[in-house]
Amino acid sequence: MTAFQLQAPFQPTGDQPAAIDQLVDSLQNQHRFQTLLGATGTGKTFTIAAVIEKIGRPTLVLAHNKTLAAQLCNELRQFFPNNAVEYFISYYDYYQPEAYIPVSDTYIEKSSSINDEIDMLRHSATRSLFERRDVIVVASISCIYGLGMPAEYLKAAISLTVGQEFDQRQLLRALVSVQYNRNDLELTRGRFRLKGDILEIVPAYEDRVIKIDFFGDEIESIRYLDPLTGEVLQKLERISIYPARHFVTPEERLEVACRDIKTELDNRLLELEKAGKLLEAQRLDQRTRYDLEMLQEVGYCNGVENYSRHLAGRLAGEPPECLVDYFPEDWLLVVDESHVSVPQIRGMYNGDQSRKKVLIDHGFRLPSAADNRPLKSEEFWQKVNQCIFVSATPGDWELEQSENRIVEQIIRPTGVLDPEIFVRPTEGQVDDLLGEIKERVQLNERVLITTLTKRMAEDLTEYLQERGIKVRYLHSEIQSIQRIEIIQDLREGVFDVLIGVNLLREGLDLPEVSLVAILDADKEGFLRATRSLIQTIGRAARHIRGQAILYGDNLTDSMINAIEETKRRRAIQQEYNQKHGIIPQPIVKRSSNSILAFLDISRRLNSQQLEQVCENIEELSLEQIPELIQQLEAQMKEAAKNLEFESAAKYRDRIKQLRDKLLNHVR
């Protein structure tokens, strides 16, 4: 029995029990790599959840984009409501890295916008890893970037116990040293205030207030308070307050780092002057000396991450410490959609280094700036204790690492079979497709169409719109939240046909889609390779009448392989259904509002997102309403403070609506 408590309204069925047992057995026999080869819709996430429960180790679940990470986090939180399921993605809403373009002599300064809410979730993840073992962190690939040293972060934490003697002024200095700011007027995340013998802190990793009552220098009580109502939520005997930033540099380490930076600067200036690069030398000297002054005076400077090697005391070329270093030695890695995620891990380092080299060569940065980087692929895998690759189409590298430890999961709990596949010629393909679409629309079903080019997708969208089809086009410029909303609208029948290029493959859960059409299926290449075709065909694998039409004049090797693999899986599924008397059932998966789903991860929404939630009040669960009322009250007070009385009145009315809904339920 482990600390993980899996809660699900169903038991493992089909080949899930065998898959769970095989994976657990492989992990317990200390095999480093294993693969779960699971067809679309077979419940791979549930299988992984069951494995985590049985193994009982802290787990990192790696997803290849933020949208998929959010989806996985929501699912795992439903499976493990009593355990810590954390969300760790890049905290930038906007990020323009520092760069230099020699051809036009253009220097682009780094500019970024940090999402405070996501920063809180990142801190919550690292705090959970220090305090408990029943932790699952769902992360994007950005987790392989440097994150500061876990040992220093833990060492800098301030431990407080009821009855402990702690000089108040010393405690305030300690809070400032770990990047907390004093603000006696407004108490928000990363701030504290002192009123008489009462110290209130909002830690970096949550939005509750920690209230510490002193009697002289003795800690009399420690309590968690609701930030809005002041209600006591929990009484504590002890607490650890972790730093407000992950990058923590002790004062003595900072002095050594500044000396090392100065030494490197002197050596680099000699190199540049010998090479006749006087402009570059002058530029580097001026910039670095200014940064050194800032570091010595305030312990911080813009672009401080470029000095991370010196600040951390690493040797040249040594890998930075990142999220995986916060895990204990026996941690488990799960790589979701591994055929996409693994190549992403490989590509992160090379892209970063090419940009840094230009900055270093032209005197914008010291050579040590190159060590502020993501992990190389081999460095990342060296840190991995044990790993499960999860994919319907695992890559060759994953299969090679797993050797014969490949666990197939082909049977769907619903009995739904893999789609039927039809190959049709390209001549008259659009008119043929139009007929298929009309047939599906009559049955209130949805259609996905994938094209090879953006231009073709646009033209096809226009053509279908002119013929009265409700169609949308999904392209790469659409942001993550908008993308989820478009998919949401497709599921709810706002439109019937979705067209895209490379956006219709992994991670789309669309039970309403009964037809996938692949245009130019015979054009060999990345988008029409075997794995891509299987993934795209799989988008119709959740519907009992799922079909895929491949339009092409030739049968390529990729098409043949994809068709044969789908037929093989379909035959296994049919045989299982006949043997057990299973009649395929449609997947009844309630479409959940994307903003409400985001609310499950991020308990704080901006004003625009709050408005979208309020427009869907009927969809809110009773558990979500109190949280939403608190957020609306905070927005109402903020609006009133800014003299925006119309907005404040609107929030007041929304709060009344929500309270009425709660009261009606009680009655």
From Swiss-Prot:
UVR domain: from which residue to which, for each copy?
A: 626-661
Its cellular-component GO annotations read: cytoplasm; excinuclease repair complex
User: Which of UniProt's keywords are assigned here?
Assistant: ATP-binding, Cytoplasm, DNA damage, DNA excision, DNA repair, Excision nuclease, Helicase, Hydrolase, Nucleotide-binding, SOS response
> Which parts of the sequence bind ATP?
G38, A39, T40, G41, T42, G43, K44, T45
Specify the Helicase C-terminal domain's residue ranges. Answer: 429-595
Described by its record, this protein's role is as follows: The UvrABC repair system catalyzes the recognition and processing of DNA lesions. A damage recognition complex composed of 2 UvrA and 2 UvrB subunits scans DNA for abnormalities. Upon binding of the UvrA(2)B(2) complex to a putative damaged site, the DNA wraps around one UvrB monomer. DNA wrap is dependent on ATP binding by UvrB and probably causes local melting of the DNA helix, facilitating insertion of UvrB beta-hairpin between the DNA strands. Then UvrB probes one DNA strand for the presence of a lesion.
Fill in the domain comment.
Answer: The beta-hairpin motif is involved in DNA binding.
Q: What is this protein called?
A: UvrABC system protein B
- What organism, scientifically named, is this protein from? Microcystis aeruginosa (strain NIES-843 / IAM M-2473)
